[in-house]
């Protein structure tokens, strides 16, 4: 077995820092679903995280990253919404619930997870919007995040 894949559930090469990109993608997809469920139900965030983590444990695989994303988004929602606000064409609560969940997750990663390259954040968000969102939702998500990244990741985006 290749040393880069040994012991990793996805079987794909991992980065030097030990991160398995496939497992992170799964964690992001599940986080989008959990954020969506939280937005719709308005229920207790901690209970939702625990329930979702328990039910989805096999699929998530990178449970620690899923939980970090969930706590990050829920604990910083107002700040994330404010950071995204100037790049939206309407209030955040008026954005379709799936696209809103995708934007909040990506907004969290752009603002707080500087270990994740902004292009990865945007690409993952586009893929989630394509998978779960409306027909053209990914185009909207891409436009918002491209503009937001210029401000939130000035050094990285070269502006």
UniProtKB/Swiss-Prot annotation:
InterPro entries registered for this protein in UniProt: NusB-like_sf, NusB_fam, NusB_RsmB_TIM44
CDD domains assigned to the protein according to its UniProt record, in alphabetical order: Terminator_NusB
One Gene Ontology biological process: DNA-templated transcription termination
UniProt GO cellular component terms: cytosol
Pfam family for this entry, one: NusB
Keywords, in A-Z order: RNA-binding, Transcription, Transcription antitermination, Transcription regulation
GO molecular function list: RNA binding
Region (Disordered): 1-20
PANTHER family named in the record: ANTITERMINATION NUSB DOMAIN-CONTAINING PROTEIN, N UTILIZATION SUBSTANCE PROTEIN B-RELATED
Similarity remark: Belongs to the NusB family.
Role according to the record: Involved in transcription antitermination. Required for transcription of ribosomal RNA (rRNA) genes. Binds specifically to the boxA antiterminator sequence of the ribosomal RNA (rrn) operons.
NCBIfam families membership: nusB
Protein's recorded name: Transcription antitermination protein NusB
Species this chain originates from: Stenotrophomonas maltophilia (strain R551-3)
Gene designation per UniProt: nusB
């Amino acid at each position: 077995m290749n040393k880069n894949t040994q012991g990793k559930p996805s079987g794909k090469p991992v980065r030097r820092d030990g991160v398995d990109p496939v497992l992170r993608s799964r964690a992001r997809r599940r986080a989008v679903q959990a954020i969506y469920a939280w937005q719709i139900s308005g229920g207790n965030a901690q209970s939702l995280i625990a329930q979702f983590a328990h039910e989805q444990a096999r699929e998530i695989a990178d449970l620690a990253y899923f939980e970090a994303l969930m706590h990050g988004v829920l604990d910083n929602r107002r700040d994330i919404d404010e950071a995204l606000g100037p790049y939206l064409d309407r209030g955040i609560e008026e954005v379709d619930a799936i696209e809103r969940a995708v934007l909040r997750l990506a907004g969290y990663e752009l603002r707080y997870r500087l270990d994740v390259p902004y292009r990865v954040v945007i690409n993952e968000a586009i893929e989630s919007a394509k998978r779960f969102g409306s027909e053209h939702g990914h185009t909207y998500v891409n436009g918002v995040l491209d503009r937001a990244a210029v401000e939130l990741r000035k050094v990285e985006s070269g502006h």
